[in-house]
Amino acid sequence: MKVLAALALSALALAKPTPPMPGMSLIQTGPQETRWVTDAEKLELTMNNVGFFDITDMPVTASSVTKPKSYAFPGNVSHQADVKPLLGKLSSDHLMSNLQKFSDFPNRYYQADTGVQSAEWVLSQVQGVIGKIQGAKAEKIEHKWKQPSIRAIIPGKSEKIVVVGAHQDSINGQNPKAAAPGADDNGSGSMTILEALTALVSDQKIAGGQATNTIEFHWYAGEEAGLLGSQAVFQQYKQAGKEVVAMLNQDMTGYGKTMGIITDNSDSALTTFTKMILDTYTTAKYADSECGYACSDHASANKAGYPSAFVYEAVLGQDNPAIHSPDDTIDKLDPAKMLEHAKLVVGFAYELAFANL
């Protein structure tokens, strides 16, 4: 009887909640704050810059936070001789050419056909970058919604994983079906990490699988609808027992003068390491900032128990005012600023790829 009772309680705990009305979503706006909302209410939250997790279709465990494991990240850089030549291979012209193509999609909404097409385009670019590397993979991660996430895997000697991520979707806050070029949010971050990946895999040791750790680059679907893609990925990793030792988020890289180092819902030790990378490999100015609960995809990694860091384009309040509108266009962005973010990504990924963690 005790066994049956335990099984019944277990089943109850794992049962998915039922919406009060069809089509509503269960969102989380704080560690202990959940509520059901309509699509219109979700859109209003997005327009008001209120971060939230949409946990409607996530595992029940996704509503709770797993404390990230502590790692002793390097206190010094060790690979300047390898990294600095890679930085010289970064091209702002190439980055901006890719961004122009990416922002030419009418929108990249996660439930739109054009959101699927833009994801397929990202996949084709990634395949072109890593397709000839033995053991490397470029693949789609299918979800319950239309747009897939995209993942690049460059294997190392261990199964410990260093992740660099950016969300690929865009949204028009007034009407999800309307124009949303999303050049800055988040075409800039998506193409920044693509440019960094291109430089990174030109290194023979990285491409030859000689790195200590495996490197993954992610382009997440559905961030604007409640961090959907990144939640799905990191919750799946958590359930599979994968060890992600670090995650760097790049959400908006093209605007502002001083980068914002996000200190909430992130790992303090990894953030300190990230500042060291900025000081060593970039000329960027930066300052600490906060973006609130569930503001971007690093929060999904943090929630799943993985150390994460987020370097934003600016301190909050000095960022691009044109996001979530038809006016988020490429002409407002600074190619040199985006290149500094790409340098950060290359340095971060390379140093941690060879770190003993």
From Swiss-Prot:
InterPro entries: M28_fam, Peptidase_M28. Zn(2+) 2 binds at D185, E224, H324. Its EC number is 3.4.11.-. Glycans are attached at N76, N186. Zn(2+) 1 binds at H167, D185, D251. Its cofactor is Zn(2+). Disulfide bonds join C291-C295. SUPFAM superfamilies: Zn-dependent exopeptidases. Binds 2 Zn(2+) ions per subunit. GO terms for cellular component: extracellular region. The keyword Metal-binding applies. It is an enzyme of class 3 (hydrolase). GO terms for molecular function: aminopeptidase activity; metal ion binding; metalloexopeptidase activity. Pfam families: Peptidase_M28. GO terms for biological process: proteolysis. Monomer. Probable extracellular aminopeptidase which contributes to pathogenicity. This is Probable leucine aminopeptidase MCYG_04170. It comes from Arthroderma otae (strain ATCC MYA-4605 / CBS 113480) (Microsporum canis).
